Amino acid sequence: MLEQEVYKFITKYNLIENGDRIVLGVSGGPDSICMLDILNKIAEKKLIDFEIIVCHINHGLRENAIFDENFVKEFCKKIGVQCFVKHVDIKKIAEEQKRGLEETGRIIRYEFFDEILQKTNSNKIAIAHNINDKVETIIMNIFRGSGTAGLIGIEAQNGKFIRPLIEIKRVDIEKYLKEQNIVARHDESNDENIYTRNKIRNIVLPFIEKEFNPNIVDTIDRLSYIVKEQEEYLESQTEKCYNDVCEQELNLTPDYRLNNKNNATIVIDLKKFNSLEKVIQKRVILYSIKKIFGTTRGIEKIHIDDIIKLCNNNIGNKYLTPNKNLKVENKKKKLRISAIIKYKNSQL
């Protein structure tokens, strides 16, 4: 039974522990409703002593969005779970911030999750990604030419974020809902092959399953675990090397938003840094950037290569700005990796 499978996965990786209060991101679609129903049953049976709270965002992009919202609210009312709803004009925000709709929606969602986390004194956020989402992400990362870390895909836990369904197939989620007589909402935009992920989901993977490997989802999932083991070892070596070459961490906090405002800076001893193997040098740079911003999104191979050249004085400039948030400077035999302060109405 799927409920038992999810429970075993949760306990195997300690995703949920006694005393947890968890915010669930629920759209009303099959994955999130399945997650909500199963976690609610686990909580009701006291298999683990934890609480769940639901949050739902109405993006205002689809005519059916109000029906999704009402469905989530009614479902939560039926099972006695608190539900927070937020209305946002994603299209307007995307235009103002000059971002794509998909990226803007993701940012707004995660900001709302964090807002409810703090408001309710919760400590974890549950996202309903499944194994198909994970494999689709890995394929997208391959198409982008990502490093080996991109072959890991979506992890079961990343800080406060947990994904209880990450090893469950989409077909099994649909089967579970049918058995429970639950008719979840359907987002018709998932059927439109205009987004890369939809093309992979609806065209690429079915073609591979039919023509090459009917078990491609399991095969890629197995690959991700092999890569994860290797990455964990390399990351531990990177952390050791970072601690050896890092001289100072200035204005660095666990709150990445503050780091961006406070000109957080990591100072690295160039002599020690240049003695490292190049593969570790690149990882130390990425590790430093992630320490400041919480992500390496937007940092590409060419940026890292240019920073390595800067460290070896093989580039004309003494500093680089790989993007609008990041500055890297070679100064007085030190490498300074800094968040760029954004001034409002500044004359600088």
Protein language model annotation of sequence segments:
Residues L2-D31, D49-I53, I108, A156-N158, ...:
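AMP-forming adenylation/ATP pyrophosphatase catalytic core
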Residues G105, N193, R197, E277:
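Residue-level marker of regulatory loop/turn positions in helix-turn-helix DNA-binding domains and
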Residues I93-Q97, T196-R197, E229:
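Short, solvent-exposed polar/charged micro-motifs at secondary-structure junctions
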Residues E69, I107-Y110, G145, N198, ...:
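Hydrophobic alpha-helical segments, especially transmembrane helices
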Residues M1-N141, V171, E179:
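ATP-dependent adenylation/nucleotidyltransferase module used to activate substrates
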Residues E51, I66, E95, I194, ...:
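Non-catalytic, surface-exposed connector residues within folded enzymatic/regulatory domains
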Residues K124-A128, D133-V227, N243, L250-P254, ...:
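Catalytic subdomain that performs nucleotidyl-dependent activation
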